[in-house]
Amino acid sequence: MTDNINKESTTTTTTIDHTTNLLIDKHVEYIVKLGSKKDSFEYWVTEHIRMNGMYWGLSSLYLLKSLDKLDKNEVIQWLLSCQKSNGGFGGNTSHDDHLLSTLSAVQILIQYDALDKIDINSVVDYVVKLQREDGSFVGDQWGEVDTRFSYAAIMCLSLLKSLDKINCEKAVEYILSCQNFDGGFGSIPGAESHAGQIFTCVGALSILNEINKIDIDKLGWWLSERQLPNGGLNGRPEKSSDVCYSWWVLSALSAIDRLHWIDNDKLKSYILKCQDNETGGIADKPGDIPDVFHTFFGICGLSLMGYFKDQIESIDPVYALGTKTLQKLGLNLPWNKNL
């Protein structure tokens, strides 16, 4: 979070059972306070991904119906200070541009209905230039290739209504080349299947209306196998559960209409147990220290499963933005069951 953008929040004094209830007030307070913790280790080691952190924090507040708890103008001014001359955005004011931070910047501006604050064409040009001849995308000038970048580019251009500026056919071909025999996807061709990469590939293919080119049931089986006896989800076989996969796995299952293939109630229970009932926030595992990353994805998981409908907003499984926000943009969301 940036400095001095906190607004006064109300401290909750009532003791609530965090294993059965979502501690909304505490989570809001936790997120709002993040920007003031300049003396913490976490503040400085995450400096380079502050744009992503801002997206996670703001999106959490949106889902908790508390977006107004941060000063909109200060957030936008800080965001604009992170844009570079080539149109891309850095993770912070003093950091190089990157595709992932550029996507986060666009998502933040959309949530604030403030796309008019930037030169959209310059952002589009920046993203378009990152596509390679084989259809893949690099994340920045240094040339790393990853399916995360394909998703980020495709989603960013879709939000800016400029998908016609890239070779979508080649982009699809490259993504499909990253699919494995088990139905999952890796970061590059031949890489191990991982839930995070599956989320990006399913999301990109969904946006491009090419999800029918994969074996839905095989992928759904692989994803449903990620649920462990404790109710949580892991990202690949033989790994422990982690709240972040409540988004990576669930979003992909939701996009392919297989959300009912896992035990939603057990996952809900796992997420709630990962809440910190003293400070607020959600951790990766029960008893661990919370952070904004897992707080956001834990709330996202609960939203996707339809829990606490009266308390949290609906999120889209592909764009990772509020359903109402996307409806205002006039985007076609055939995979979203909340429409």
Swiss-Prot record:
Keyword list, A-Z: Metal-binding, Prenyltransferase, Repeat, Transferase, Zinc
InterPro entries (UniProt xref): PGGT1B-like, Prenyltrans, Ptb1, Terpenoid_cyclase/PrenylTrfase
GO cellular component labels: Rab-protein geranylgeranyltransferase complex
Entry binding sites for geranylgeranyl diphosphate: 194-196, 236-248
Residues that, per the record, bind Zn(2+): D242, C244, H294
Ranges: PFTB repeats: 24-65, 72-113, 120-161, 168-209, 216-257, 264-306
Class in the EC hierarchy, top level: transferase
GO biological process assignments: endoplasmic reticulum to Golgi vesicle-mediated transport; protein geranylgeranylation
Superkingdom of origin organism: Eukaryota
UniProt GO MF annotations: Rab geranylgeranyltransferase activity; small GTPase binding; zinc ion binding
Any Pfam family: Prenyltrans
Cofactor: Zn(2+)
Family: Belongs to the protein prenyltransferase subunit beta family.
Role summary: Catalyzes the transfer of a geranyl-geranyl moiety from geranyl-geranyl pyrophosphate to both cysteines in Rab proteins with an -XXCC, -XCXC and -CCXX C-terminal.
Subunit and interaction comment: Heterodimer of an alpha and a beta subunit.
Entry protein name: Probable geranylgeranyl transferase type-2 subunit beta
Lineage: Eukaryota, Amoebozoa, Evosea, Eumycetozoa, Dictyostelia
Gene from which the chain derives: rabggtb
